Every structure is written in structure tokens, then in C-alpha cells.
Amino acid sequence: MEADPCRREREEMVEFQIRARGIGDERVLAAMRKIPRHLFVPKNLERVAYEDRPLPIGEGQTISQPYIVAVMTEHLEIRSHDRVLEIGTGSGYQAALLAELAAKVVSVERLPDIADRARENLARAGVTGIEVVVGDGTQGYPPEAPYDAIVVTAASPEIPQPLIDQLGKGGRLVAPVGPRECQDLVKLVKREGRVETIPLGGVCFVPLIGQFGWQGEVSP
């Protein structure tokens, strides 16, 4: 029996869905070849885990399509010594990729049950070095700030100011910004005395709920 039955599916995902569409960071590609996405989706969806589409993970949340995960990860420009903050743990898949690239990963999840499942998924996949915290992601996580990179996996009307404040000098932040339905993916780079904004294209993410995001439904 093959030790890793989904290895070929991951290879094909990387080559045909990701590299073929312009993602060229070899460290990102290697991480996506390694991390078993099928361990981060519900059991009944494992057979479609490597298709290029988002999948439901419960409580109205999703695991993003592989290509969008790759785009966001590449634009973070993560170095091996970086400290990274993720807002919206979800399934834990994005955090697992970040852990392959960075020295430290903190991930904040609003929903306790989703956070618990993410921890279980990460343990099952053998991924370590990630601190999963339950809280309001729009407030970031000040105890570990500043961060070299921040990725936000849910959309808000504008980028929460606490996240910009917790980004270190030269830091990169990637987030979807705009209405609840569909948004623009943007990259912020914190320069000396200013913040540069770079548009990355249209996306559709679940809403980021919290004090500095969409209001209401703060508790599940």
C-alpha cells in the first residue's frame, strides 16, 4: 500500500492549478506539495480535496481554493526567520503552509469549535510550531507583535487598524477588502513612514466578524 496515497494528486494540483497559473516561489510550491490538504477537509469531501475550489468546513466557514491560498502565500514573501500572524484559522491548512515557511506562526480564530478542529487537523497532519488562539481576529494578537507578515483569510470593509499597527517595519499584509459578497485582494507593505497598497485582483471570502470588521454575530 502506498504510504502517501494522495501524493500524485498534490503534485498535479501544484503543477496544473498553481505553477501553470504563474506561482513561481519554489518554497511555496514545495510546501503545497508536502501538506496533505485532504486532512484539512471533512471526511466526506476528501475525494475532492485537491480540486481548485473552496470547500465547506462547517459553521459557515470554508477552506479556500488552492490557487488563492498560493497567491496569498507567495505575496507574503515569507523568509525562514519571519514571524507570521494569520487571522482566521479555519481548517488550519493555510497555517500549516505558513509553518513550513516561517519561524513562528500565530493563528487567531473567532469560533472555538473551528479552532479545536484546526488543532486536530494540524496534529493529524504532523504539523507543529503553530499557536492557535481563540479571539477577535480584527484586534490581531498584540502579545506576539510585531509581525513580519500578516494574512487575513476573511473579508472586511477595510483593513483593521490594529493589524496595520502590529505589522513590523518592512512587513507585508495580504487581505481581502470590500463588500460581504466579493472583494479585492490587496497587499500592504509597511515602509518608513508610509503604507504602500498593491491590488492583487478580485476574490470572494467569508466576512471577517469583529470589532474592526463586520459588526454583529461576534459570537457563534
Swiss-Prot record:
The entry's keywords: Cytoplasm, Methyltransferase, S-adenosyl-L-methionine, Transferase
PANTHER family per the UniProt record, alphabetical: PROTEIN-L-ISOASPARTATE O-METHYLTRANSFERASE (PTHR11579), PROTEIN-L-ISOASPARTATE(D-ASPARTATE) O-METHYLTRANSFERASE (PTHR11579:SF0)
CC annotations in GO: cytoplasm
Entry's family note: Belongs to the methyltransferase superfamily. L-isoaspartyl/D-aspartyl protein methyltransferase family.
Entries under SUPFAM superfamilies matching the protein: S-adenosyl-L-methionine-dependent methyltransferases
Molecular functions per Gene Ontology: protein-L-isoaspartate (D-aspartate) O-methyltransferase activity
Protein name as it appears in the record: Protein-L-isoaspartate O-methyltransferase
Species of the source: Methanoculleus marisnigri (strain ATCC 35101 / DSM 1498 / JR1)
PROSITE patterns found in the cross-reference section: PCMT
Catalytic activity: [protein]-L-isoaspartate + S-adenosyl-L-methionine = [protein]-L-isoaspartate alpha-methyl ester + S-adenosyl-L-homocysteine
A Pfam family this chain is assigned to: PCMT
Protein function: Catalyzes the methyl esterification of L-isoaspartyl residues in peptides and proteins that result from spontaneous decomposition of normal L-aspartyl and L-asparaginyl residues. It plays a role in the repair and/or degradation of damaged proteins.
Keyword Methyltransferase: yes
Active site: 64
HAMAP family linked to this entry: PIMT (MF_00090)
Subcellular location(s) per record: Cytoplasm
